[in-house]
From Swiss-Prot:
<keyword id="KW-0408">Iron</keyword>
<dbReference type="GO" id="GO:0070475">
    <property type="term" value="P:rRNA base methylation"/>
</dbReference>
<protein>
    <recommendedName>
        <fullName>23S rRNA (uracil(1939)-C(5))-methyltransferase RlmD</fullName>
        <ecNumber>2.1.1.190</ecNumber>
    </recommendedName>
</protein>
<dbReference type="InterPro" id="IPR030390">
    <property type="entry name" value="MeTrfase_TrmA_AS"/>
</dbReference>
<dbReference type="GO" id="GO:0003723">
    <property type="term" value="F:RNA binding"/>
</dbReference>
<feature type="binding site">
    <location>
        <position position="90"/>
    </location>
    <ligand>
        <name>[4Fe-4S] cluster</name>
    </ligand>
</feature>
<dbReference type="InterPro" id="IPR012340">
    <property type="entry name" value="NA-bd_OB-fold"/>
</dbReference>
<comment type="function">
    <text>Catalyzes the formation of 5-methyl-uridine at position 1939 (m5U1939) in 23S rRNA.</text>
</comment>
<feature type="binding site">
    <location>
        <position position="342"/>
    </location>
    <ligand>
        <name>S-adenosyl-L-methionine</name>
    </ligand>
</feature>
<feature type="active site" description="Nucleophile">
    <location>
        <position position="389"/>
    </location>
</feature>
<dbReference type="InterPro" id="IPR010280">
    <property type="entry name" value="U5_MeTrfase_fam"/>
</dbReference>
<keyword id="KW-0411">Iron-sulfur</keyword>
<feature type="domain" description="TRAM">
    <location>
        <begin position="10"/>
        <end position="68"/>
    </location>
</feature>
<dbReference type="GO" id="GO:0070041">
    <property type="term" value="F:rRNA (uridine-C5-)-methyltransferase activity"/>
</dbReference>
<comment type="similarity">
    <text>Belongs to the class I-like SAM-binding methyltransferase superfamily. RNA M5U methyltransferase family. RlmD subfamily.</text>
</comment>
<dbReference type="InterPro" id="IPR029063">
    <property type="entry name" value="SAM-dependent_MTases_sf"/>
</dbReference>
<dbReference type="InterPro" id="IPR001566">
    <property type="entry name" value="23S_rRNA_MeTrfase_RlmD"/>
</dbReference>
C-alpha cells in the first residue's frame, strides 16, 4: 500500500557573523567577503564593522541583514527623510553624496573598462520635478493612504514629506492629501502625479470611477487656489485637462511644451548640464548634419538644431514625434525634421538618411540599442554621443562601436538620481582615422 506523508521541513539556522564592509555597490549595499564570496549587506558603509544575520547563501554570493552596527564610517550621515529605510524611493541617504558618487563612478569604470572623466551632478536634495504617489483608502481607519511603495513590497508608505522632491511639490503634499481625503469618491482613486513645470506645478489624478460633480468642483477650486494645472485620468489612455495652461520646460534656453504623460528628465539641473555637455562633445559645425535617435520630443534635437545645418530626430512613439514637430515650430526652427520609425529596422535605408550624417546622438531606454548600433556604423559618423540609463547595456553596445574602429574619448557619470541606485552616463565615441 502506498504511504503518503509530508516530508519534514528543512530548518536553516540563521547564522550570525561579524563582517567588515570594504565597498559600496551602485545600489547602496555594503559589500563584504564571507567564505570567499561577496556578501551584500544593506545599511552598512565601507570601513564599518557589523554583526549581521545571513538570510541568503548562494554559490556565488550571499546576503545578510544588519543585527548590530559596531563602528561608524566618517562617510555616514543622518538621513534627511523620516521614511528612509521603509520607503522604497531612496536607498542611500545614509551615505555622503561624495561616497555615493564615488561608488557609482567606480561601478561605471569597471563596466566600461576605462576611467570616468567627469561626474555631472546638481543639487542632491529637492531635485525631483516629477513624482507619482499611490492612493489607497483604508475602510477600517477611514483614512486615505498617499505615498510611495515600501521597499521590496507592495504596501504603501504614507509620506508626510519627501526631501528629494522639488520644494514646490513637497510643500503641496499636505494640501493634496487634505483635498483628496475630502472627495466622496476617495474609494476610487488610483494615484496622483505631481509635476513641476517651468511655468508652475501640475497634478494628474487617476480615478477608477466617474467623479461626482461636487468632487470635480472641489478639485478645480483646489487647483485655482494653489495655482496648479489640473488633469483627470478616468482611464490610463484618457487625459482630461480641467484647469491651467499647458506645461513647458526649457532645454538649452528653448521652450518645450509637453503633456503630463510625456517623458521628461526628472532632474532638471542635471538635464541642462547633460544637454550642454552633449553639444560640446559633438563639436558641432555650421555645416553638420546630425541624427538624434530615440529623440523623444526634442530635448537634445532642438538645441542641436541651433548649431547645425540640419538635424533629424527619430522616435518610436508617434505622440512624441508630433510634440517634437510642435516644439520646433514654437521655437522657429526650420532646419529640424522629426520622423516616427521602428528603430530596430535599418534606418540607413530611409530617404532622410541618403545624405548621411556627420554626428549621431542616441538616448535609448534601459534595454539599450543593440539593433541600432550596426546601422550607426553604416552611417559612419565622425562622432557619436551615447546617453545611457543602464550601464550594462551601454557596455554591451559600446563593444559594437569599438570593434568597428571607434574610440572612447570621454566618459561621464550622470548623478541624475542622488540617494538611489540609479546610475546614468554618457559617452563620446570618435571614429579612428585610417
Amino acid at each position: 500500500m502506498a504511504q503518503f506523508y509530508s516530508a519534514k521541513r528543512r530548518v536553516t539556522t540563521r547564522q550570525i557573523i561579524t563582517v567588515t564592509v570594504n565597498d559600496l555597490d551602485p545600489f547602496g549595499q555594503g559589500v563584504a567577503r564571507h567564505q570567499g564570496k561577496a556578501l551584500f549587506v544593506s545599511g552598512v558603509l565601507p570601513q564599518e564593522q557589523a554583526e549581521v544575520v545571513l538570510v541568503e547563501d548562494k554559490k556565488q554570493y550571499a546576503r545578510a541583514q544588519v543585527k548590530r552596527r559596531l563602528t561608524d564610517s566618517p562617510q555616514r550621515q543622518a538621513p534627511r527623510c523620516p521614511h528612509f529605510g521603509v520607503c522604497g524611493g531612496c536607498q542611500q541617504q545614509h551615505a555622503s553624496v561624495a561616497l555615493q558618487q564615488q561608488s557609482k563612478r567606480a561601478a561605471l569604470a569597471r563596466l566600461m573598462k576605462r576611467e570616468v572623466d567627469e561626474v555631472i551632478a546638481g543639487v542632491p536634495w529637492g531635485y525631483r520635478r516629477r513624482a507619482r504617489l499611490s492612493l489607497n483608502y483604508q475602510p477600517k481607519t477611514q483614512q486615505l493612504q498617499m505615498g510611495f511603495r515600501q521597499a521590496n513590497a507592495k504596501a504603501i508608505v504614507d509620506v508626510v514629506q519627501c526631501p528629494v522632491l522639488a520644494p514646490q511639490l513637497e510643500a503641496l503634499l499636505p494640501a493634496v492629501r487634505e483635498c483628496l481625503s475630502a472627495l466622496s469618491a476617495l474609494r476610487h482613486l488610483g494615484h496622483v502625479e505631481l509635476v513641476q513645470a517651468d511655468n508652475g506645478p501640475l497634478m494628474v489624478l487617476r480615478h477608477t470611477a466617474a467623479l461626482p460633480a461636487g468632487d470635480r468642483e472641489k478639485l478645480e477650486r483646489f487647483s485655482q487656489t494653489h495655482g496648479l494645472s489640473l488633469y483627470l485620468a478616468p482611464q490610463s489612455e484618457i487625459l482630461e485637462h480641467i484647469h491651467g495652461e499647458a506645461p513647458w520646460y526649457t532645454s538649452d534656453g528653448l521652450r518645450l511644451v509637453f503633456s503630463p504623460r510625456d517623458f521628461i528628465q526628472v532632474n532638471d539641473g542635471v538635464n541642462q548640464q547633460m544637454v550642454r555637455t552633449a553639444l560640446e562633445w559633438l563639436d558641432l559645425q555650421p555645416e553638420d548634419r546630425v541624427l538624434d535617435l530615440f529623440c523623444g520630443m526634442g530635448n537634445f534635437t532642438l538645441p542641436l538644431a541651433t548649431r547645425a545645418a540640419h538635424v533629424v530626430g527619430v522616435e518610436g512613439v508617434p505622440a512624441l514625434v508630433e510634440k517634437g514637430r510642435e516644439n520646433a515650430a514654437l521655437n522657429g526652427l526650420s532646419n529640424v525634421t522629426f520622423f516616427h520609425e521602428n528603430l530596430e529596422e535599418d534606418v540607413t535605408r530611409q530617404a532622410w538618411a541618403k545624405h548621411g550624417f556627420d554626428k549621431v546622438l542616441l538616448d535609448p531606454a534601459r534595454a539599450g540599442a543593440p539593433g541600432v548600433m550596426p546601422h550607426i556604423i553604416k552611417l559612419a559618423p565622425r562622432r557619436v554621443v551615447y546617453v545611457s540609463c543602464n550601464p550594462a547595456t551601454l557596455a554591451r553596445d559600446s563593444e559594437t562601436l569599438l570593434q568597428a574602429g571607434y574610440q572612447i574619448q570621454r566618459l561621464a557619470m550622470l548623478d541624475m538620481f542622488p540617494h538611489t541606485g540609479h546610475l546614468e552616463s554618457m559617452v563620446l565615441f570618435e571614429r579612428r582615422l585610417t
